[in-house]
Structures are given as structure tokens and as C-alpha cells.
Amino acid sequence: MEKFIIKGGNPLEGKITISGSKNSALPILAATLLTPEECVIHRVPNLSDIRYMLEILKFLGAQVHYEKGTVRIKSKIVHSTAPYDLVRKMRASICILGPLIARCGQARVSLPGGCVIGDRPIDLHITGLQKLGADIEIIKGDVVAHGGILRGTSINLKGKYGSTVLGTDNVMMAACQAEGTTIIEGAACEPEVEDLAHFLSSMGAKISGMGTQQLIIEGVKELHGCEYTIITDRIEAGTFAVAAAMTKGNLLLEHAPVEHMGSVLEKLKDCGASIEIESQGIRVSRSGPLRAFEIVTAAYPGFPTDMQAQFCAMATVAEGTSKIVENIFPNRFMHISELKRLGAMIELSQNQALIHGTERLSGAPVMASDLRASAALVLAGLVAENTTEVHRVYHIDRGYEKIDEKLSSVGANITRVYSKI
């Protein structure tokens, strides 16, 4: 395993280029299973989750070539089974279920892995695909599906904690080749879902209502190959924006998707950061104090749950008491115990955290538990006195492309080394 050694105290100044969106890339890669023709996808980030997905596609029979951010895929499917050893490492692997049912008429996909951040069931995926006509059951930890002829229908994907993003992806992909018209009510509106819809349209799918809670998909007989460029990652951009604000730096976030970052940028302004929209991207800086804030996570366009941990880290050094309410994944607070090791003062009650700002954090060894928690610990390390060691950084490699190199390029003192832990 590897760890980061961070010596805090340096303001971050310069330019960081934002990578392609991980949460767009994974379902888009899965969607290439819908056609035997070649798909060329640009701006694919070099992440461990991406590499896992490409390994799954190769196992299923796809020819894959990945070089310098561009993936070329030609899917000649020889297997419709994705075993546990392949899918256990990431949750988004469930995205292959819908395409396999649509293309092969059957699928066997082990229940997925990924971040451990509370209850994230796939019941809405299964319900939606069943309504299209798939016969699905869970057998020994595998989702076993027989498709037959998929037929358009009306499906509601609204769940207990809002609309399901991956569930919307799965049902939308399967519906593209179903007979007739499918109407998805309660569809997730996230930019990454809209990006997938645009990709499917480039393949010949007929989809309307993109970016809204109602998607209308008219089934077509077949989809074709295409060339497509993925949107940039709003969560990566938001994370670096928080880093600039926390370190009292000045960063230009090149190609940051400003149109997808409204709630995050507004909250940064409330906290005392300066936000300037430039031709190349977004410039984030801070000269005055960091102010306490309140956030409530919500489905897009609300405040994203994937930015909650990073703002929690920022709150530890803001003036006053901040309040965070986590409504999407109520148990997504595994970073709090580790932030406390650095001197953070945090009270946790169910899905709410009160963070009392302190003048300084003090470096210590900490353990990453999931993707966004690891980002929060790195951010805290950037402002902590002395040295912070962040262990199990394989979590952060799942969603941030070369984060240590990007931070080093703008002045951070961060080193990746081998760790026995």
C-alpha cells in the first residue's frame, strides 16, 4: 500500500487542469456494450476505477485500447457473466447489467463493491429493469437476469433518499433498445446522467427530457459506434476549489465545469472565498478569514453529497460553528473520527455534524476510509501544522487523477511513499 506524507502550511498558487468526470466515464464505458461497433471516448481519467471497468469489459469480450485519455472500445461480447473477483472493487460495475440484458438477453453480475458509506441498495435498478420485462433474481450474491423481449413502460425511480443516479443510468441504457416508449419518472438530474444520455444519443438513441426528472426514451432496433468527449469532473474541481480557499491560495481551475458547480461555488463565496469566472475556467482565492457555514446535501442541483467531506474539512479551520446535514447517505461521516485526530472539534448526531472551527490543526497519522473521506484528510493535511500521514490512499486513486502531482505543481508539500499499513 501507499500513503501521502503532507507538510502543511503552503498556499496553493498556479493552475490545475481538471480531468474528465469519473462518474460520467464509468456508465459511458458500460454503454459501449450496447453496440458491436467501435466507440472512441476522449477525456477518460486515468483512475483505478476506470481501469477496473476496462478489465470487466475486456473479460466480457471487448477489445480495449486506452492511451493518453482516449479509450477505443469494440464490444464483441463472449460472456454475459461478470464474476465477483472483477466487480467487487467498485459500485459502478452494476452499470453493465442494463446493457448486458439489452444486448444479450441475459446477464449474471455479482453484487458490487466500492466505498463503504452506508446503505446503497440496488433495489431500484432491479425494479426498473423488471418493469421493462427482465426476469431478475438474486442467487448466491449474484444478480441473475433473463431479458427476453424488453418493452417500454412507465417507471418511477424515486427512492427514500432521492433519485438513484446509477439506477437511472441502468434503466436508461436498457430502455434504448426496448420495444416502444419508456418514460422514467423521478429520474436523476445529475450532469453525469445527462452526459450519458448525450452519449447514447450519439450512438443513435432517441432520448428527450435530458437533465430533467422525466426521461422519455423511444426504443430503437440497434445502436452504432460514435466518438465522444466526456464532461470535466465537478467534484474534482470543487475539491481543488476548497483547497485554494483553505490554504489562502490562488488557483485557476482550467476547464472546470462552472455550469455544474453552482451550489458549491455559492457556498464557497459565503465562506469568504473569491470566485472569478475566466475564459480558461474558474479562479478561486481567499484573502480574508474563512467563515462558518451551513450545508444540507441534496440531489442535483442541490449541494452534492460528494463534496460534504471536503467542506467538513474546511469547517474545521473556519471561524465559528458550521453545521452539515447529510440527507443522501446519512452514515457518510467516517472522516470525522480521523479529522479529530488532527485536532478538529466535531459533534456528530445521526445525520448532522456540528464543526467548531479551531485556529490550527496538528499533523498526525490518519486512515482513509473511502474516496471523498480521503480527499478531506488530504485537505486537512494541507493546512495542519507539522506532518500529516494519510494511509490507504488507494481510496483517493479511485476518483482523483494524480492528485499528489497536481497539488505538488501548485506548491503543496506532498509525497507518495510505500506504507506497510
Swiss-Prot record:
Record's keyword annotation contains Transport: no
Keyword flag Metal-binding: no
Pathway this chain belongs to: Cell wall biogenesis; peptidoglycan biosynthesis
Entry EC no(s): 2.5.1.7
Any Gene Ontology CC annotation: cytoplasm
Location of this chain's protein in the cell: Cytoplasm
Gene3D superfamilies: Enolpyruvate transferase domain (3.65.10.10)
InterPro entries per UniProt: Enolpyruvate_Tfrase_dom, Enolpyruvate_Tfrase_sf, MurA_subfamily, RNA3'P_cycl/enolpyr_Trfase_a/b, UDP_GlcNAc_COvinyl_MurA
2-(S-cysteinyl)pyruvic acid O-phosphothioketal: residues carrying this PTM: 115
One GO-annotated biological process of the protein: cell division
Keywords: Cell cycle, Cell division, Cell shape, Cell wall biogenesis/degradation, Cytoplasm, Peptidoglycan synthesis, Pyruvate, Transferase
GO molecular function annotations of the record: UDP-N-acetylglucosamine 1-carboxyvinyltransferase activity
SUPFAM superfamilies cross-referenced by the UniProt entry: EPT/RTPC-like (SSF55205)
Binding, UDP-N-acetyl-alpha-D-glucosamine: 91, 120-124, 306, 328
Any Pfam family: EPSP_synthase
Main enzyme class: transferase
Residues that bind phosphoenolpyruvate: 22-23
Catalytic activity line of the entry: phosphoenolpyruvate + UDP-N-acetyl-alpha-D-glucosamine = UDP-N-acetyl-3-O-(1-carboxyvinyl)-alpha-D-glucosamine + phosphate
Function: Cell wall formation. Adds enolpyruvyl to UDP-N-acetylglucosamine.
Family, per entry: Belongs to the EPSP synthase family. MurA subfamily.
Name of the molecule in the record: UDP-N-acetylglucosamine 1-carboxyvinyltransferase
Name of the coding gene: murA
